[in-house]
Design a protein with these regions (language model features):
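Intramembrane alpha-helical segments
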Residues: 4-9, 50, 57, 77-168, ...
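N-terminal, positively charged, Ser/Thr/Ala/Gly-biased leader segments
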Residues: 1-21, 25
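Generic alpha-helical transmembrane segments of integral inner-membrane proteins
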Residues: 24, 49-57, 97-105, 119, ...
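Multi-pass membrane catalytic core of lipid/isoprenoid biosynthesis enzymes
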Residues: 44-52, 68-118, 193-234, 273
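Extended hydrophobic alpha-helices typical of membrane-associated regions
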Residues: 2-5, 218, 225-288
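Small-residue-rich segments of transmembrane alpha-helices in multi-pass membrane proteins
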Residues: 21-26, 81, 142-157, 202-205, ...
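Cytosolic, membrane-interface loops and tails of multi-pass inner-membrane proteins
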Residues: 1-5, 60-87, 181-205, 253-262
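Helix-coil boundary and interhelical linker segments in multi-pass alpha-helical membrane proteins
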Residues: 27-50, 102-116, 150-170, 221-237, ...
Length: 288
């Protein structure tokens, strides 16, 4: 049980609420819009959830392994499992390999397209770990790694690409990229000292927050497009309105002079935003 707790801490399992709700939204849309009833529905649902868990374990495990020396020098992250000695770098890397294999095997059991795309998905979710060493756009790479979740969930059901899940992927990418900029404010000085790239390390705090707001404007615009293309239902519009309100609250709470609220804005509000939107959209899709 102690080992499970350590690895759950390694991958920040609680942060699964950022991407999983969007995958379930896309899965629901794929099912209700299918021209014929989806066979083995519960098996497909299980496969999608397993893929989400395995892919996230790969992403977070690889990130912690790749960055453990950097984390050890940062007072904010020195207590993480690898630099703190709770999990060895070798054990963490094996954890990544095992989850990557499990992910690929699971995609093979779904359909040919998910199987062929599985290496691409793994490459994307691992890319973020090194992007911060080269580009300030790493925030968007992180967003993309979460954004592929709704596309993958749709493909798992339908075996093809479609516009609506791709729009939702853009929603997730810009939403996540925006709140990651806010989160990165905590490491601004450290990143500058170490030569690491991030929006806050490159720009002033105020400019960084403006960029974050700009990305969230794109999020809301894409969300409105997404909602407009779905079956018109009051529940879906309520979900979009509440999601937008929570995003606005995030920027009210975090300003250049009020950075103490970063933890609440990053974890609590964004988790609430994704769960709220998914709940109302799924209800709307099922009752449309």
């Amino acid at each position: 049980m102690n080992a499970i707790s350590k690895y759950a801490g390694l991958v920040k399992f609680s942060h699964t609420i950022f991407a999983m709700p969007f995958a379930l939204m896309s899965l629901t849309y794929a099912i209700v819009s299918a021209p014929a009833p989806v066979s083995d529905l519960w098996i497909v649902l299980l496969q999608v959830v397993l893929c989400m868990v395995f892919a996230r374990n790969v992403a977070m495990g690889f990130n912690r392994w790749a960055d453990w020396r950097i984390d050890a020098e940062n007072p904010r992250t020195a207590g993480r499992e690898i630099p703190a000695g709770k999990i060895s770098p070798k054990a963490a890397l094996w954890f990544v390999v095992i989850n990557a294999i499990a992910f690929i095997i699971t995609t093979i059991t779904i359909n040919p397209l998910t199987a062929w795309l599985s290496p691409v998905a793994l490459a994307i979710v691992m890319a973020y770990s090194y992007c911060k060493r080269f580009t300030s756009l790493a925030h968007l790479v992180l967003g993309l790694s979460l954004g592929i979740a709704p596309v993958g969930a749709y493909i798992a059901v339908r075996g093809e690409f479609a516009l609506i899940p791709c729009i939702l992927a853009f929603v997730v990418m810009t939403w996540c990229g925006s709140f990651d900029i806010i989160y990165a404010l905590q490491d601004r000085d450290f990143d500058r000292e170490r030569g690491l790239h991030s929006i806050p390390a490159r720009f002033s705090i105020r400019t960084s927050l403006y960029i974050s707001i700009g990305l969230h404007v794109l999020t809301i615009a894409a969300l409105l497009w997404y909602v407009w293309l779905l079956p018109h239902n009051i529940w879906i519009w309520i979900g979009a309105a509440l999601f937008t309100a929570i995003i606005i609250l995030e920027h009210v709470l975090v300003t250049p002079s009020r950075q103490r609220n970063i933890g609440i804005a990053f974890g609590t509000l964004n988790g609430l935003a994704s769960l709220t939107l998914a709940t109302f959209v799924i209800i709307g899709l099922l009752t449309a």
